[in-house]
């Protein structure tokens, strides 16, 4: 054998090996004048949960351009098929085009097989496409739906890795949303319970992350119905103005005034038509 793998008994506690490795790499790069790439913030909170009869997906509605709010009411819950929807975080153009492409391919697959597509099929299509581009398509997705095998919920990362869990969160506000899920989630919840839980999780992301904000959208998918609730709630209502804040003309005194005359040179031009006959 060229190499021998020695089994080590696992020890309790968090392992800081990767932290030490990153510190060594950062110091080595600094000597050569390079900087390690920083994590890219997606500026969104999206989440999903499995309840007794189906799936509840949720998202905020703020779209950002750096530190500027570009859109206060954008829709981040995308149609994949009549029984499957997908929340998108990351680059808005990438999430829109990726979900449209997969929705189109899934419709062709459905017409070919003559049945409603399965959620695992959509998951496989998405992960294969994203893995092919090695993370350069900035689409972090939460895929949920109900098919003949029951409700399914997946989180899909931009590099193509996926998780199948009873509750998932993605985006820059995902840590706050996950804290709510880990505290209040329980199996086999009723629909209203699940909607309230997802709403609280998205609200936690909105109030604890600058990249998330505005309203909360929900999508409820079950075998018997599909409810798209936009908006489900508005946690950030604009305050009412109680007075006028515009000063009347003449309120501030003019301290200095200077009038400068402009020298204008007037040129006269004549235009003659050319005879083309």
UniProtKB/Swiss-Prot annotation:
Q: Return the InterPro entries for the record.
A: Ntn_hydrolases_N, Pept_T1A_subB, Proteasome_bsu_C, Proteasome_bsu_CS, Proteasome_sua/b, Proteasome_suB-type
Q: Which GO terms describe its molecular function?
A: threonine-type endopeptidase activity
Under SUPFAM superfamilies, the record lists: N-terminal nucleophile aminohydrolases (Ntn hydrolases)
The compartments listed are: Cytoplasm; Nucleus
Q: Where is the active site?
A: 44
Under Pfam families, the record lists: Pr_beta_C (PF12465), Proteasome (PF00227)
Please tell me whether the keyword Membrane is annotated for this protein.
Answer: no
The reaction(s) catalysed by this protein are:
Cleavage of peptide bonds with very broad specificity
UniProt-listed GO biological process terms: proteolysis involved in protein catabolic process
User: Record's superkingdom?
Assistant: Eukaryota
- The EC designation for this entry is 3.4.25.1
Q: How does this polypeptide assemble, per the annotation?
A: The 26S proteasome consists of a 20S proteasome core and two 19S regulatory subunits. The 20S proteasome core is a barrel-shaped complex made of 28 subunits that are arranged in four stacked rings. The two outer rings are each formed by seven alpha subunits, and the two inner rings are formed by seven beta subunits. The proteolytic activity is exerted by three beta-subunits PSMB5, PSMB6 and PSMB7.
Q: In its UniProt entry, what is this protein called?
A: Proteasome subunit beta type-7
Underlying gene: PSMB7
């Amino acid at each position: 054998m060229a190499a021998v793998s020695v089994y080590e008994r696992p020890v309790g506690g968090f392992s800081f090996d990767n932290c030490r490795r990153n510190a060594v790499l950062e110091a080595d790069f600094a000597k050569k004048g390079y900087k390690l790439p920083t994590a890219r913030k997606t500026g969104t909170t999206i989440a999903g949960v499995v309840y007794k009869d189906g799936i509840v997906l949720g998202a905020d509605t703020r779209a950002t351009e750096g530190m500027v709010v570009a859109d206060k009411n954008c829709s981040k819950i995308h149609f994949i098929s009549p029984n499957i929807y997908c929340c998108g975080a990351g680059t808005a153009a990438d999430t829109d085009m990726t979900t449209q492409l997969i929705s189109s391919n899934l419709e062709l697959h459905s017409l070919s097989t003559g049945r409603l597509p399965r959620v695992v099929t959509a998951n496989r299509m998405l992960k294969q496409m994203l893995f092919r581009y090695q993370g350069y398509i900035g689409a972090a997705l939460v895929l949920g739906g109900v098919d003949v095998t029951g409700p399914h919920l997946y989180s899909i990362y931009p590099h193509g890795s996926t998780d199948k869990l009873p509750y998932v969160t993605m985006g820059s506000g995902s840590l706050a949303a996950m804290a709510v899920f880990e505290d209040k989630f329980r199996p086999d919840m009723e629909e209203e319970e699940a909607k309230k839980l997802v709403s609280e999780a998205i609200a936690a992301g909105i109030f604890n992350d600058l990249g998330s904000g505005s309203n909360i959208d929900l999508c409820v998918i079950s075998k018997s119905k599909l409810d798209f609730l936009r908006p489900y709630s508005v946690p950030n209502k604009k305050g009412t103005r109680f007075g006028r804040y515009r000063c009347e003309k003449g309120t501030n005194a003019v301290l200095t005034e200077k009038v400068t005359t402009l020298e204008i040179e007037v040129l006269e031009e004549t235009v003659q038509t050319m005879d083309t006959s």
